Amino acid sequence: MKLLLSNDDGIFSPGIRTLADTLAAAGHEVMVVCPDRERSATGHGLTLFDPIRAEAVASLFHPSVKAWACSGTPSDCIKLALGALLDSLPDFVLSGINQGSNLGTDILYSGTVSAAMEGVIEGIPSMALSLTSFTVREFQPAANFARDLLAKLDHTPLPEAMLLNINVPALPAAEIAGVAITRQGIRRYHDMFKKRVDPRGKTYYWLAGEVLEDVNDPEQGVDSEMLTDVQAIRENLITITPLKYNLTHTPGLQTLSTWLNLPLLLQTDP
């Protein structure tokens, strides 16, 4: 398969190096287009008012891998690759392996997930991969899982382009309890802004905080007995959550239709 890889941790991240090398060794044609520096939590931001530069990178990856370091965001990387750097579209877009989980509402901020979502917007099935630790750097189990899942998808393709958001417990492969198809959970943070003063006496703020327990908020139309990604990770399961870019609140369509009197709203005073 022809694969396009990106991330938000940057071109020098061991996560993408492990993923790219593992997939190249499995015989895939691998292209890497990554930010040239750390770009975590940039969401789906794009660079509109500055030039985007891309430089070929040698000696970081498996010899068969073609790689570029891009000055833009993770979403810029995928857009640039599909629109300018590649001679043909890939079969799959992969983003990661991220250092740290992307669970529940994390995905709204995640550059990792946004890069993969950019592939889906272009009609290409995509995968976001995250290791659920900010300190453990053993990415091989997650890379092996991606390799094996791609082999399965090559024989049994997805019926439509979608994003598979995958989180892998930061454990040795033998200690991972299995794989679960999950629904997106909710992850809340207690945000704290630390007030500081720079050497010139100017005040600035540093965002900190801690993760709170997930909130049980079953989505209408989804089996509430199905584990959320947050719950499944607690049970040491690899999670696969299918995502889409259409954010329409479907039940809200009916609610608004019965609640709002649109003709009345359009009336103006004489």
Curated annotation (Swiss-Prot):
GO molecular function, one term: metal ion binding
UniProt remark on cofactor binding: Binds 1 divalent metal cation per subunit.
Gene Ontology CC: one annotated term: cytoplasm
Enzyme nomenclature, EC number: 3.1.3.5
Family named by the database record: Belongs to the SurE nucleotidase family.
Organism: Cyanothece sp. (strain PCC 7425 / ATCC 29141)
Subcellular location field: Cytoplasm
Protein name: 5'-nucleotidase SurE
SUPFAM superfamilies, per the entry: SurE-like
Keywords, comma-separated and alphabetical: Cytoplasm, Hydrolase, Metal-binding, Nucleotide-binding
Known cofactor(s): a divalent metal cation
Stretch forming the signal peptide: none
